[in-house]
Structures are given as C-alpha cells and as structure tokens.
Amino acid sequence: MTLLTHVLACLFGMGSWVAINGIWVELPLIVPEIPEGWYLPSYLTVLIQMANVGPLFVTLMHRFRPGKLDERPVIYSIVGLGVVATFLLAFFWKHTVPLAGATHSVPLLVLCFLLSVVDCTSSVTFLPFMMRLGPQYLTTYFVGEGVSGLVPAVVALVQGVGVVHCRNATVASLANGTLGVNSTVGASGELQAQYQPANFSAQVFFLFLSAMMVVCLAAFLLLNHHPAVAREKKCEQYFNGGLAEEKSDQALSLSHRPQEEKPMISSPDSHRRARQSSFGTGFYSGPELAFIFVVLAWVNALTNAVLPSVQSYSCLPYGNQAYHLAATMAAVANPVACFIAMFLPLRSLVLIGLLTIVGTGFGTYIMAMATLSPCPLLVHSASGTTLIVIAWVLFVLTLSYVKVIIGVILRDEGHSALVWCGAVVQLGSMLGALSMFPLVSVYGLFKSGDPCNTKCTK
C-alpha cells in the first residue's frame, strides 16, 4: 500500500509546524483582544527561540550518547503535548493574569511556548524517524510540512482574519457612543480602520488546530503499527543495535544503492571517489558538506525568520488584499516546491547554489520594499501589488526547493546527517530571528502605516 504510506507521511509532516503557523496567521484576530497588543509578534519570536532548548537536548543526546535516544517516544510526547496545548489555547487565550502591576496574557504566552517546543523539536525528531521508511517518502513528508503552513492560511482566509474597512472616525465614534469631552477625534473627516467580525471565532480556529494535531498523532501511530506500512519499512536493526554506531549506512556501498538514493554530483568519476570524510557515507568532502550546511542555515534564516518578520511591512502598504494574497500564495508555493522536487530531484550542488542566489534576490526585493514602508515603490499601482505577490511566491518556491533537495541529500548520508540537518534548520532560524528582533522591535527601522490615512506621493 504505497499510497497509504504516502498519505500517512504527508499527514505526519503536516503536524510538524501547523500549530505555530496557525498562531501566526491568527494574530490579526488575537492582537486587538489582548493587553500585549502588537508587541505579541515580538514576544512570539523570543518564545520560539527559547523553545530551541528542545532540539538542543535531542542534538546533544545524539552527539554525546549516540544510540541512547529513540525518536519514537519523543515524538509521541511532543505530539501529545501539541494536542493538549492547542485544545487549552481555545479556551484560555483571552485570559489575563495580574503581573508586576500590569495584566498579561500569561496562559497564551505559556501555551505558545509549549507549542514552540513541540514544533521546534519536531525538526530534529520527525526527519530522523523518516529513515525508517524508503527514500521516496521523505519528499512526501516535506509536502506535508509545507501543507502545515498552507492549511491554517486557507482556513484563516475563510475565517476573514484581517479584513478591514475604513469609516469616518467621527461617525464611528458617535455610533459607538465614545465621543466625549476629552476625545481627540475632530470633524476633520479622518478615516478609522475597523476590522470586521470574523466568520468564526478564534476558539473554533484553535480547536481546528487541535484536531490537526490529533490527525498527526493518528498518522504516526499507523506509520509505526499498520501492517501495510510495516512491509515497506527498512531493516529494524537500524533503530536497535545498529543505531548506536550508525554502521548500517556505512556498510551499504554506493554500488548497491538504488539509483534514486545516489547523491548526484556532476563529476564523471564520482563512482570512483574515495571516502572523503567521516560523516555519513563519506561521499561528500568536508568543504562540500560545509557548503550544504551553510546554505541550509542561510535559507532557513531567510524563510523562517528574516523575511516573515517584515512581511506586513512589505505587503500592507499595497493593501490588505495584497498581504493576504502574498501570505496565502507563498504558503501554496511551499508544497508546490515539494511536488516539483518529488518528480525532479536535481541534486547538483551547483544548481543548489544558483537557486539560493536567485531566491535571495527575490528576498532582497522584499526587504527593500519593507524598508521603504509605508511608501514603497509603485505603491499606488496594480503592478506594485503584482510584483510584491510574485516576489513572495518565487522567494518561497525557490528556497523551499533548495531545502527539500538538501534534505534528500542528507537523507542519503544517514541518520546522523538528518539529525544535524534539523539542528542546522533551527540554528539558522534562531540566528535570523535574533538578528531581526532588535531591528524591528527595538530600533524601529521598519515603519508601519495606517491602512486608511497614510498618504504617499505618486
């Protein structure tokens, strides 16, 4: 039942980041209801980086106590925690607690931290677990990981998150009975942004996220125990006695590997290359491995931290529709890149480098528009809206393809390589977030605009 295994691998991957991705797309609905206000994204960035204690623990265990940590119990624990945390979030996200003379959304922040631990730790446990299955299922897993961002975005659009209408401030205040003696609203006809009620509440959205985590848990159970999946598993000794020394991968000669598992380097005498390093199969030299991991860290820094932190600044000046189109279509581009990699797995390091440069170019354009906010280039034209949406889509498409291909390459290098793959993913994301946090939240280098009152010269 190859199809069943593909479906389960996709559903399993979908649970990797669905919780945090869901919280991010729900922010426009949450922020007006809590005392932290628009500081919440900055707090979330810090919480996610603090949650890297999870992957740090797993990575150190693999480094200093190889073979002592089985990913399966860890995965059961973190996915179960994700189910409980998202369920509690549905009922406690609006609750506040007096703390240090002010009210804070302590339950929301604590639950967000726990979900960050779940999702960050998945990067160094889900990927190594996929070594139990054939190499063709790794790309399917990445498709599911991409869908973990797509599904919450689509549901949020159906919910109506962030839909804004402009009304005359004086009229709105009179209608609400809020225009008093000390009111600063005059008769100047100033417009006021009003967010319309969502089609369903944040509570329903968080219950949906909890259901998604339950689906992930069920998929993981079936991947471990379904008879049809068991027939396709690799040799179990890899996860028993063989895991400690990780010799099973080294014992496989390149000449006996299936064609799709061979690393594809354009060198004509690659099959005669001697072992060049002690890492994995040793097929790649030290500089080549360094290049792979540096690119992996760079790509994840851009896609997971640097550009997402300024997405609103780059898109909202062009209008709310541009922002939602960019967010949704970029989320679609991720699984599309995984599908492309499934049928066109070009593992050339030269191609990886070129695609990284191209994707970085699109990211540079996005960053430039964010820097010029609230009046970026072509802000009053349809071409400006089109360009920013296309830039986001191509940025995510190219760099997502790079991430998937690097994952496939490192999968061929063995279990340890995938563990370090997950660690580098988190390292790159952490460095990107730590570099952007002071720029956005402390120094205020990026300026926001009012969707109804900001005026830009044409």
From Swiss-Prot:
Glycans are attached at N168, N176, N182, N199. Residues 249-274 are annotated as: Disordered. It is a multi-pass membrane protein. Keywords: Cell membrane, Glycoprotein, Membrane, Transmembrane, Transmembrane helix, Transport. Pfam families: SLC52_ribofla_tr. GO terms for cellular component: plasma membrane. The chain crosses the membrane at residues 11-31, 38-58, 73-93, 97-117, 146-166, 204-224, 279-299, 325-345, 349-369, 388-408, 417-437. It catalyses: riboflavin(in) = riboflavin(out). It comes from the Eukaryota. GO terms for molecular function: riboflavin transmembrane transporter activity. Disulfide bonds: none annotated. It is found in: Cell membrane. Belongs to the riboflavin transporter family. Plasma membrane transporter mediating the uptake by cells of the water soluble vitamin B2/riboflavin that plays a key role in biochemical oxidation-reduction reactions of the carbohydrate, lipid, and amino acid metabolism. This is Riboflavin transporter 2. It comes from Salmo salar (Atlantic salmon). The gene is rft2.
